[in-house]
């Protein structure tokens, strides 16, 4: 298990409060398997993996916002495709 220096991670984010918010968001993604870890898991819990990613500069608040926006756009596109498909099925029935 790798050690995480919270101070180094906080320095990457800006302050410890934003660090907690960013790490919690990322850990939730990892826990729900919505995203793959950007660092080796090494049998660590999602919170430790999130902190390691932040410490290495792979994740920050802006990156998290972009990932979530991309996910929302992909979900909206999938929903629109499903609606179009159902409309076509109904029209042909």
From Swiss-Prot:
InterPro entries: DNA-dir_RNA_pol_omega, Pol_omega/Rpo6/RPB6, RPB6/omega-like_sf
Gene Ontology CC terms, in alphabetical order: DNA-directed RNA polymerase complex
A single GO BP: DNA-templated transcription
SUPFAM superfamilies in the cross-refs: RPB6/omega subunit-like
Organism domain of life: Bacteria
Gene3D superfamilies, alphabetized: 3.90.940.10
EC numbers: 2.7.7.6
The keyword Transcription is annotated on this UniProt entry: yes
Keywords in alphabetical order: DNA-directed RNA polymerase, Nucleotidyltransferase, Transcription, Transferase
GO molecular function (one): DNA-directed RNA polymerase activity
Reactions accelerated catalytically: RNA(n) + a ribonucleoside 5'-triphosphate = RNA(n+1) + diphosphate
Function according to Swiss-Prot or TrEMBL: Promotes RNA polymerase assembly. Latches the N- and C-terminal regions of the beta' subunit thereby facilitating its interaction with the beta and alpha subunits.
Subunit structure: The RNAP catalytic core consists of 2 alpha, 1 beta, 1 beta' and 1 omega subunit. When a sigma factor is associated with the core the holoenzyme is formed, which can initiate transcription.
The family this protein is said to belong to: Belongs to the RNA polymerase subunit omega family.
Protein name as it appears in the record: DNA-directed RNA polymerase subunit omega
Organism of derivation: Actinobacillus pleuropneumoniae serotype 7 (strain AP76)
Taxonomic placement: Bacteria, Pseudomonadati, Pseudomonadota, Gammaproteobacteria, Pasteurellales
Gene: rpoZ
């Amino acid at each position: 298990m790798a050690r995480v220096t919270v101070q180094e991670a906080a320095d990457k984010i800006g302050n410890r409060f934003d660090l907690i918010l960013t790490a919690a968001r990322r850990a939730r993604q990892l826990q729900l398997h919505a995203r793959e870890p950007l660092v080796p898991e090494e049998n660590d819990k999602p919170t430790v993996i999130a902190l390691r990613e932040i410490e290495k500069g792979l994740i920050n608040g802006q990156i998290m916002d972009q990932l979530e926006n991309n996910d929302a756009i992909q979900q909206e596109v999938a929903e629109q495709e499903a609606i179009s498909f159902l409309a076509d099925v109904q029209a042909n029935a």
